[in-house]
């Protein structure tokens, strides 16, 4: 059969290799803005919808349904679910065997509880409390194989509580059993008070657990990995084995509680070892060997494995033998003879003792609750179902509240009995119900027969069932190889639970798990990606040999959420990859920048006073004083003060063509708007000459001289990288501080002539950007792309011809032609292909260089001729229909357009009209990068359908042009 499966799998894999699949998708390059325009979002379902509810019946129907009501009932009462789907023929026999075995084991455990807890509790009170607790967990519990009862390790924590009011001068706590006369009124009063302390502690423990369950604090267990739960259960198993040494060797010691109590008890056992009972040791070894042999016996019922109930036969057999002959071993008979009552009526706890026991109750509630949750999760993982931690907290809280009226100890999940119930074939809580009934029946009718049962039998049964929890210690080497963090958490939880106790160890485990989870989730892992050749797949450059990097484009993948913890590491990583460092500005540098931007209007005066009735300029949104320097050449790689403002829309009546005005406002556009400059809101940008311009506009030489006074100008920056792409496909959360620093990063690199693009943002991240006011006219949704490949295509499409092919000095001017949306839709000559993929031609938009220097303040009215430029070999399709030959009426159109532009009044002679006009590129109908521009008059923006913008080239840009310098001279 296995060979057939392997052959089928190999045949399927070979068939998959033969039938290779390929896909060819042709679509436009989408950014977030264009994608939302074409594909509308669904309406928000946040619950704030305006629904007209007229009657109470409609009000209830909008919020309640039969399905929700049924789900709520099944959550509160889980037994209804397994009762409705109970398979009687398959599960009944296993549940009966498991219930009888658990019930028989629970009888001697209840009798020896007083011996371990060092408190004389009547046996029938323990039996009734255990029965009520089992029934309550059957109704409200969510674990199918859980057995509820008194757990002696939790009861051992009551030693500190019993020291508050010892009734026999502390002799029982110290391990000396001296039978006293209960007829003395003082002795009986002290005994009743000690029982009241135990009952009040159990009641307060149950109340705390109920509060934890109602508040939903069970989610804490979900943050604890499997390694932490295994380590805690292993530590509990060691504590159980240590406590059973009392029964194995037949000696009594003084138990300790608190830190290092584990080692104190070991020392006490070693001291008392010469008094060990050899008969008890022999009985213990006999039980262990019998249970070990029993593991080799396999029984199945209806294809369900059932282990032979050896514990049932051992308890019955040794009980019969002990009642026939004297075995000279330690039994529970000695302690039971000291108890004055067999049963005490239920009473209410003494609430006056609550302030004295609140710390002990809190410690008991934590240990008992999480022990139950850990054990339930461990068992549920073996049977492929899940448990509800909050529901279990409520269930165990009710169990302890009810058991407190019987003056019993704290109840929780019993590890040994739970394992016995699971391996004996128990499938549902019906087995626990059967076990509780058997236990109560035996304790009421035949309890005295079990008084002579050797305690070593119970110790052998418990140790044989808890030893498997120690097997995780042998798995530590493999756990270290799998995950070092989990291995470290395992060792920390185990060692703290052994050295400091179960309560403190649990707190340390939870805190350590939270810390490790937080560190791992917020630890920034930034990968530098490259492209797999001839694909749209991008992987880490360190993982594949054939991977290629795109010139001028850096792709970074963020593999964690962006928070205040790791956002600065992201910034440091980006600066490191582009070989730049940040350096704080000096005072004279800041003063020089302020002097060049503000005080030049008053002739260099530092202090000036004037009256301004207009609204104050809004404060910049992000302020910090630092500059970036190249590591290799800091003198030639500095940029201006990073001083970013909140860009708002200056005019709501702007046309679509105005949104495509380039970011750097040219001197010609400044001159054209000279009359309206005072009405334009000022925005402080690096090297923004509009900030320095006066209504009179000085001449070219003066403006160039003023520009040279700025100590750190981006005109000297020669970036080898023109675009940085951040892959946010693995980012699921960005906090407020991360958004602020991320915005600073975008503006800082923008001032360095490096564009930041973000790819693969989840919709929740985009909404977080919108809620935190991340976008404005400077940083828009056009910088957000749906995939990394979209961002790469856009980054390559915006490359311009740089200094490697064309020699552009500072006096050269670049002219870009833009069209309005209506002009693009009406004229077919400006259409472009609907896809960037699938074309043999590789055309990239470029700027036309004007060979002859032109005066800066001259006004140009030029048409640019379309030219094509070879790309970089990527799958770019920038198909354009070239503009047809110009007709004679083009000259009249040019004259008309020239008349529409605002003419300056002071210097009309500075406007030469060139004779030849080369035509410009037909740019795609996109708005990927809307830049800031001063507002135009509303009347002019409505009538002007085609605009021209002249940009001042501050520095050459790297580009790729295999045809070399093919531009025509103007």
Curated annotation (Swiss-Prot):
Give me the gene this protein comes from.
Answer: SLC26A8
What is the protein name stated in its UniProt record? Testis anion transporter 1
Supply the alphabetized keyword list: Anion exchange, Developmental protein, Differentiation, Glycoprotein, Ion transport, Meiosis, Membrane, Spermatogenesis, Transmembrane, Transmembrane helix, Transport
> Which terms in the GO cellular component ontology are assigned?
plasma membrane; sperm annulus
What tissue expression does the UniProt record report for this protein? Expression observed exclusively in testis, restricted to the meiotic phase of the germ cell. Abundant expression located in the seminiferous tubules, concentrated on the luminal side of the tubuli harboring the spermatocytes and spermatids.
Which branch of life, at top level?
Answer: Eukaryota
Q: Bias regions of kind Acidic residues — which residues? A: 858-868
Membrane disposition: Multi-pass membrane protein
Q: Where is the composition biased (Basic and acidic residues)?
A: 877-898
Q: Which residues lie on this side of the membrane: Cytoplasmic?
A: 1-95, 141-146, 224-232, 292-307, 377-392, 451-452, 519-970
Transmembrane spans: 96-116, 120-140, 147-167, 203-223, 233-253, 271-291, 308-328, 356-376, 393-413, 430-450, 453-473, 498-518
Instruction: Specify where the region named Disordered lies, as residue ranges.
Output: 858-970
Please indicate if the UniProt record lists Acetylation as a keyword: no
Region span, Interaction with RACGAP1: 664-970
Functionally, this protein is described as follows: Antiporter that mediates the exchange of sulfate and oxalate against chloride ions across a membrane. Stimulates anion transport activity of CFTR. May cooperate with CFTR in the regulation of chloride and bicarbonate ions fluxes required for activation of the ADCY10/PKA pathway during sperm motility and sperm capacitation. May play a role in sperm tail differentiation and motility and hence male fertility.
Kindly give the Pfam families that the UniProt entry links to this protein: STAS (PF01740), Sulfate_transp (PF00916)
Question: GO MF annotations for this entry?
Answer: bicarbonate transmembrane transporter activity; chloride channel activity; chloride transmembrane transporter activity; oxalate transmembrane transporter activity; sulfate transmembrane transporter activity; sulfate:chloride antiporter activity
Q: How is its activity regulated?
A: Activity is inhibited by 4,4'-Di-isothiocyanatostilbene-2,2'-disulfonic acid (DIDS - an inhibitor of several anion channels and transporters) and gluconate.
Bias (Low complexity) occurs at 938-948
Variant or mutagenesis effect after changing residue 954 to C? In SPGF3; there is a reduced interactions with CFTR and complete failure to activate CFTR-dependent anion transport
Extracellular face: residue ranges? Answer: 117-119, 168-202, 254-270, 329-355, 414-429, 474-497
Clinical condition linked? Spermatogenic failure 3: A disorder characterized by primary infertility, sperm morphologic abnormalities, and moderate to severe asthenozoospermia, condition in which the percentage of progressively motile sperm is abnormally low.
Q: What induces it?
A: Repressed by tunicamycin, an inhibitor of N-glycosylation.
Q: Name one GO biological process term.
A: chloride transmembrane transport
Which reaction(s) does its UniProt entry say it catalyses?
Answer: sulfate(out) + chloride(in) = sulfate(in) + chloride(out); oxalate(in) + chloride(out) = oxalate(out) + chloride(in)
